[in-house]
Amino acid sequence: MNPPGSLEALDPNVDEHLSTQILAPSVHSDNSQERIQARRLRIAARLEARRREALGEYLDGKKESEEDQSKSYKQKEESRLKLAKLLLCGTELVTNIQVAIDIREIHRRVEEEEIKRQRIEKLENEVKTSQDKFDEITSKWEEGKQKRIPQELWEMLNTQQLHCAGLLEDKNKLISELQQELKTKDDQYVKDLKKQSDDICLLLERMEEQVKNVMKTFREELYNIEKAFEVERQELLASNKKKWEQALQAHNAKELEYLNNRMKKVEDYEKQLNRQRIWDCEEYNMIKIKLEQDVQILEQQLQQRKAIYQLNQEKLEYNLQVLKKRDEESTVIKSQQKRKINRLHDILNNLRSKYAKQIKQFQEENQSLTSDYKRLVMQFKELQKAMRHFALIDDEKFWEIWLMNEEEAKDLIARAFDVDRIIHTHHLGLPWAAPDFWFLNNVGPISQQPQKSATQIVEEMLMRSEEEEAEEAAAEPESYLDLPKQISEKTTKRILMLLCDESGFLIESKLLSLLLPLEQNECYLLRLDAIFSALGIESEDDLYKLVNFFLKYRAHRLSSSLQIKPCSQASMEKASMEETSTRSELELAEQTEMEGEKEESLVEGEKEEEEETPPSPWVIHPNDVLKILEAFVMGLKKPRDSRAPLRVQKNVRDNSKDSEYWQALTTVIPSSKQNLWDALYTALEKYHLVLTQRAKLLLENSSLEQQNTELQALLQQYLNSKINSELQVPPTQVLRVPTK
């Protein structure tokens, strides 16, 4: 009944799959934490593959075609799936103990390695220090041999004795620490043995319980399958008998119907053949007449084309003469331009000389400014270094002063709590419970709250949207996230849903197949988590940057679309101004055609502007999502990849709650309890006065009792004396003897 597989023997397919991932941790890494993470990932992948195989799922996301299945088959499949799930859950329940033990052992080994490393470092440091002390003592002996004065020798011997005693004390201290560590290891070993025995007992109990559950479930499912087969057998017998009778009746009816239809079709086909012959003859005559008319029309068009050709030839000759005159005019203009070019060359040479002088002057100024810049940069770096140094010192001093004051305040609070406890339990006879304030558990300055991840923000948003779906009919303002520009949560949700729908290629096919049976919000949450991990979005700020980037892109596109219309009109007017005014008939015709097209395009553009409605500023086209993501990822990688210059990076601490914290420490004992203490103090003073008076009276009473006993003893001695019997009137007859 041992669970199949262990931590060391893993599936080779899972190992190869994990090794192909570039960013995944490796089991061959030098970092122990990375090796532990790699083993955990391989175990999780292997267990997931076994679970899918047991449940009948396929890794490629394909499902078998659903056919008409009988009740017995459905019952068998349900029983198989139920038993597979039961076995899988039982195996996981049993193997969870081994996994927990393995993880605990891994943590213990890591801690043991760290302790061993620290112990080795400590021993090495001790060896170095003891060797230095021994060398110092040895060198002092050489110096002592050179001294001749007894006083100096005596002082030197005392110092050497002190050094030797210190060296031996360090060694004894180290030996005691190692012995104490060995003792703790023995105790830990006994505890581990006890824990292992408890785990084995728990494992056996779970295995016995799973065996009983599996046997019981197998019997129930076997009974259900037998019952389903019996019901299906009765239904099949009844249905097959009924189908056979219906099939015989339908066959006889179809044979009669087929004979009647065949006779009708033969008659219809004969009539259709006669009608088709008549229609074909009429159509042939009509086509012949039409073709003769087309021949006559084509002959007339040929004569018209010949006349147009003659007219175009005369126009071309006229245009040739016009071009020759223009060529003569262009030669005159070329000569004028050459003279102008020569004059401009002279001006260019003068400007080049001035430009060279300016470049030389600017280079000298640049060198001087560069030297000043380097000097200022060095001063700035030194200033930054000093600022970092003083900032660290200030933080350390602030931390020490805070801890000192906090410790002193908490000591006073503890003394006050002890006094309050004694008053309640001893004097008032009331039960006392220690107050639980939030500031008593705080140690050190109050820090800021940790930033949420992008996945947590999306999860909170989806949960909030589910709660607000029932209240959408009410006219309430939209809730806002903590965004820089107060973007509504509804807009953020739309953008994330669009991103989830259009970025499915960033999600693995295995994950998509697993998301099919989940609910909509859970599916969206897992898809967005995978997309965020692929895009490198980790923190809350990255999510807000993504939403702002989408909205800025949409606003930029709207502004550019509004600028296209005036630009297009200006370009068309400029093109019309640049057209050359020619007197030829062809150019005039082309110009008129272009103006007509321009007017038509303007009219159509005005109609389209009137017909189109302005798009919503929050609507983003799905085709633009990939472009926006590409631009966002490129912009997100640049600040992360580029190394910013060294600067003073100091976390600004939020000190808004410091006064509240120290004020809360001073008000641990409320005013009502202080009034109770004052009243109790006055009552105790009165009680103390009464007790002192009572003590004085008790002392006086004890002294009087002692005197009374002494007097009684003297009186008894006097009465018992022999002289009383000799008297004529004894005092016993006169005096009344007191009885005890």
From Swiss-Prot:
Span list, region Disordered: 570-617
Coiled-coil features, chain-numbered ranges: 101-388, 691-724
This protein's UniProt keywords: Cell projection, Ciliopathy, Cilium, Coiled coil, Cytoplasm, Cytoskeleton, Disease variant, Flagellum, Primary ciliary dyskinesia
GO CC annotations, alphabetized: axonemal dynein complex; axoneme; cytosol; extracellular region; sperm flagellum
Comp. bias regions, Basic and acidic residues: 575-586
BP-aspect Gene Ontology terms: axonemal dynein complex assembly; cilium-dependent cell motility; determination of left/right symmetry; heart development; mucociliary clearance; regulation of cilium movement; single fertilization; sperm flagellum assembly
Keyword Cytoplasm set for record: yes
Locations listed in the record: Cytoplasm, Cytoskeleton, Cilium axoneme; Cytoplasm, Cytoskeleton, Flagellum axoneme
Keyword presence, Cytoplasm: yes
Positions with biased composition (Acidic residues): 587-598
Covalent S-S links between cysteines: none
InterPro entries: DRC1/2_N, DRC1/DRC2, DRC1_C
SUBUNIT field: Component of the nexin-dynein regulatory complex (N-DRC). Interacts with CCDC65/DRC2, DRC3, GAS8/DRC4 and TCTE1/DRC5.
Associated disease: Ciliary dyskinesia, primary, 21: A disorder characterized by abnormalities of motile cilia. Respiratory infections leading to chronic inflammation and bronchiectasis are recurrent, due to defects in the respiratory cilia. Patients may exhibit randomization of left-right body asymmetry and situs inversus, due to dysfunction of monocilia at the embryonic node. Primary ciliary dyskinesia associated with situs inversus is referred to as Kartagener syndrome.
Family according to the record: Belongs to the DRC1 family.
Function recorded in the entry: Component of the nexin-dynein regulatory complex (N-DRC) a key regulator of ciliary/flagellar motility which maintains the alignment and integrity of the distal axoneme and regulates microtubule sliding in motile axonemes. Plays a critical role in the assembly of N-DRC and also stabilizes the assembly of multiple inner dynein arms and radial spokes. Coassembles with CCDC65/DRC2 to form a central scaffold needed for assembly of the N-DRC and its attachment to the outer doublet microtubules.
Protein name stated in the entry: Dynein regulatory complex protein 1
Organism lineage: Eukaryota, Metazoa, Chordata, Craniata, Vertebrata
